[in-house]
Amino acid sequence: MLDLNNFDRIRIGLASPDQIRAWSSGEVKKPETINYRTLKPERDGLFCERIFGPTRDWECHCGKYKRVRYKGVVCDRCGVEVTRSKVRRERLGHIELAAPVSHIWYFKGIPSRMGLLLDMSPRALEKVLYFVSYIVTDPGDTGLIKKQLLTETEYRDCRERYGNAFKASMGAEAIKKLLEEINLEELARELRQELKEVTGQRKIRAIRRLEVVEAFRKSGNRPEWMILEVIPVISPELRPMVQLDGGRFATSDLNDLYRRVINRNNRLKRLLDLGAPDIIVRNEKRMLQEAVDALIDNGRRGRPVTGPGNRPLKSLSDMLKGKQGRFRQNLLGKRVDYSGRSVIVVGPELHLHQCGLPKEMALELFKPFVMKRLVNDGYAHNIKSAKRMVERVRPEVWEVLEEVIKEHPVLLNRAPTLHRLGIQAFEPVLVEGRAIQIHPMVCTAYNADFDGDQMAVHVPLSAEAQAEARLLMLSSNNILNPKDGRPVAIPTQDMVLGIYYLTVEKQGVPGEGKAFKDPEEAVMAYYNNAVSLHAAVKVRMPGMGRIETTVGRIIFNEVIPRELGYYNQVIDKKVLSKIVDDCYRKLGFSATSKLLDGIKKLGFTFATRAGVTIGIQDITIPARKKEILKEAEQQVEKVEQQYRRGLITEEERYRKVIGIWNDATKEVTDALIETLDKFNPVYMMANSGARGNIQQIRQLAGMRGLMADPSGRIIDLPIKANFREGLTVLEYFISTHGARKGLADTALRTADSGYLTRRLVDVAQDVIVREVDCGTGQGIEVTEIKDGNEVIEKLEDRIIGRVALEDVKHPETGEILAFAGEEITESEAAKIVAAGIKKVKIRSVLTCRTRYGVCIKCYGRNLATGRQVDIGEAVGIIAAQSIGEPGTQLTMRTFHTGGVAGDDITQGLPRVEELFEARRPKGQAIIAEADGTVEVREVKGRREIEVTAEDGTKSVYQVPYGARLKVRDGDRVYAGDELTEGSVNPHDLLKIKGVQGVQIYLLQEVQRVYRLQGVDINDKHIEVMIRQMLRKVKVDEPGDTDLLPGGLIDIFEFEDENRRIKNLGGEPATAKPVLLGITKASLATDSFLSAASFQETTRVLTEAAIKGKLDLLLGLKENVIIGKLVPAGTGMSRYRNISVVAESEPGEENGEPGGERLYGMDELYGETAN
């Protein structure tokens, strides 16, 4: 018995007419759908019950047999088999065509597969198929040539001249005959021979033909199967017809298209039986061909067939394509049961691992569990009465619900889910009201706020799902951000402000200078109003002796675990982040979530006690503002005078004025910071990192400064006022440009960023950690990344958590600082940097040799846990999310520096896209192709650079007008160095510097864009993407292999093929590496299911069908599409046989695979957190 749910590969191919007949349950002969009086399907029509099965369970069409007991009986009156009605989703019918027609995908695609096989141009093919010209199928011994086209008149002349000595016909029949005659083996041999003899265009054509011939030869498809004699009719449930209120019917477009085919087919049959004249029959055949084309792919050829309201009908191809198609709408994104959504509000009293679930929502979501419990506990006798109890909401139902949800985690998701922290698991707590409550510290991960955001709840049902939710997805286990390994669950806003207020010191307050024997006494004194929170006091701390601190800091340190020491400083957001990080590294998840809850409680308490509010008088304008502005105005006047006298150019004037005003703005800002009191609420908010920053305070109390106009050019008239004083009309108008641009930018950016993420996910979705060590001896050498003189990424950041390729030795003492094959820890990295080492060789994803993924050693540390990555981790998806999620923070705009030509380099999101798509960059730099010495000279007003290599060969580069040189006369340059300013074309770099050169360039460029915008992403995520872009090679000379010249093939497959040929003693193939953009790389993946669900669905499927492609189901998408567990994480085959055993008694603990106990949350959070 074929098990439909358990298969490990899937193949696609062309169906032969016999195959289609074998699948079919009967022939559809009439175009009728349902009888308008009885509303029952017509016999032999498109919804016929005899072909497709009964419309009602266990009931035949005429009603002779009703009930399950007649299961499998075929009614003798109406011929309907008595069975379940859901077979109407599974059974196919067919239409026997009176004349063969071609399949539009294979005739019309680019390149036309039929045309290549027959060596005909698509135009000639179209003329034959659509009955314009005759084609000679057998010239006999006449002067005609095989496959020659004849017009109507030419055909008549030839008939008169040669009689029946030759055969010529038109339509798909003629093409079918020609396709049947093709001998693939022989054709392949001829083409291979031809390849050796011809060059140029003819060679390219021969390669293309050979590709198609080889595809047919290897897959076992026959060319004549591209011509259809039988058309399958898909199941009626997949093209339903439903009655609307008002007696009208709504139907799927496919039914209309099928009806046209059947009508025309029946008419053609009748004409053939009557022996109608040739011209009428031909017209009918052409119409049949067009009807079938419209059914398969409407609009591909000619004008699409339209329905009411001039709307093109959706054909079979359209059912698969696009966001609303079968792939993306139903297979990759399904709606799920046991889910709900509601508005979110803050739940400050929750623990980190909890969420508040509205009672009525919880009851509905956990209904089946509650019903089962009611029966088990004896409240109800059977499920039916239990259901009634739940629906009537009896009081005992609530008690049972409380028990059911205990220790049963639920998943919360907020759209858009940009990274994996957008779905986390929580333990539900029942709350009154109708809003979901969430813990304030998970807002950062969800990017949620409480201005009306909504969230969705999902219930994991099986024991396995619950265990995974608890161990992998619980919010207290997701404290670190996978993109950079820094804590993401950190205090924000009020909490930060409260802690800052608590730990800040103030002079001249009650109790200053007092001494206490222990911390408890000091806190007691504060509660008895004997000493202020901010007073500097002396306290004897256990194990630390006497220290000077404040009461607030003592209170703060009560929630800090002993192991982290005593924090005697003002605590702002940065410090808090570091405390959380240290706590996690030293003490693990449970201690960190306790700490976070402690900080949350303290923060909110003291933010409330502080009573920090903002009034208009808190915005103090610096007294020096007037004189600073006066000074600046005088300087500007001087510059204007010089310009009027013609001493400086407009450009210089503009630059100077901008410079003057920027300095003035900075001076006002400095003056402002000096005037602000340290306890000024506005200052406290900005300084603690709770909300706002100095730039915003500057606009409130300093001056707004310079603004940009709509093109991005800075207007040289500053806004001198601030918001407290109020803007003049002109100032207000000038500032609207920037505001509008900001909003437009954000809207565009969101969509672009989402699309980039989708492409990234698609290209990397099958990168999974598959083995411990791939055994490669290669790696990359990393240094710090610089932009000019500014360090963008420190060496330390680049090596922490990576595996050293070779021992790192101290340059002076020779001491080994890090061993080869071991992970470099934070402390080792610090030692390496301290020893003055500038370059370190590490293992990298870029050089990993694992076939379908990466290995542990090349990947290194999993940033989300801070430990070594596990086998089965879907690192490709994590990488795509880490790069895509901050995409919305990148700017869209191209910066214009005062309209200077040649300075416009793309930055922000468009630059990231340009790099990942491997496009030719805007403002391309010229690069040296070999090492040598530079000579710059001017020829006829054009500059050119000549590079003389060591061996005396010279290469000359023309410098385009307006380009800036990066080299001077006599400079020494190396291959791949930039000679002019701008961005390098990565494809050129690949030719000159090879794979490693382009890898490092792309990595550094992507990092540069993100770091300049203040976004930290770990190198390894970008490396995963770059590796996917360089997976393929292009075959140059095939040698004795079966490869085709110019074909793209996976590096590993290429090496396998060469190994095979070498072992047989043959000539191996040669190839060059190619760099594919992420879109191309996704479409070039081995899995046709993954490629088809991404873009260009019809093209991918056409090609896959001809090649008879096999999908090994290695990636995640393919498995989601066919409804299997994904082969990553716990879905990997090595983890499949582990089962979760339910606990027999609530008191007993069950061991969990992996050695951790399945802990109850009450142990983690004892009374201390409350």
UniProtKB/Swiss-Prot annotation:
Q: Which GO terms describe its cellular component?
A: DNA-directed RNA polymerase complex
Q: How is the cofactor bound?
A: Binds 1 Mg(2+) ion per subunit. Binds 2 Zn(2+) ions per subunit.
SMART domains associated with the record: RPOLA_N
Ranges for the region named Disordered are 1145-1170
Q: What EC designation does it have?
A: 2.7.7.6
Annotated keywords? DNA-directed RNA polymerase, Magnesium, Metal-binding, Nucleotidyltransferase, Transcription, Transferase, Zinc
The transmembrane segments are none
Which residues are noted in the entry as Mg(2+)-binding? 449, 451, 453
Which reactions fall under this protein's catalytic activity? RNA(n) + a ribonucleoside 5'-triphosphate = RNA(n+1) + diphosphate
Enzyme class, spelled out:
transferase
So where does Zn(2+) 1 get bound? 60, 62, 75, 78
List cofactor names only: Mg(2+); Zn(2+)
Q: Name one GO molecular function term.
A: zinc ion binding
What's a BP term from Gene Ontology annotated to this protein? DNA-templated transcription
Would the keyword Lipoprotein be found if you checked this record's keyword annotation?
Answer: no
**Which Gene3D superfamilies does this chain map to?**
1.10.132.30, 1.10.150.390, 1.10.1790.20, 1.10.40.90, 2.40.40.20, 2.40.50.100, RNA polymerase II, clamp domain, RNA polymerase Rpb1, domain 3
Presence of keyword Transferase? yes
Q: Where does Zn(2+) 2 bind?
A: 774, 848, 855, 858
Family to which this protein belongs = Belongs to the RNA polymerase beta' chain family.
Biological role: DNA-dependent RNA polymerase catalyzes the transcription of DNA into RNA using the four ribonucleoside triphosphates as substrates.
Assembly and interactions? The RNAP catalytic core consists of 2 alpha, 1 beta, 1 beta' and 1 omega subunit. When a sigma factor is associated with the core the holoenzyme is formed, which can initiate transcription.
Q: What is this protein called?
A: DNA-directed RNA polymerase subunit beta'
Identify the species of origin: Pelotomaculum thermopropionicum (strain DSM 13744 / JCM 10971 / SI)
Lineage, please?
A: Bacteria, Bacillati, Bacillota, Clostridia, Eubacteriales
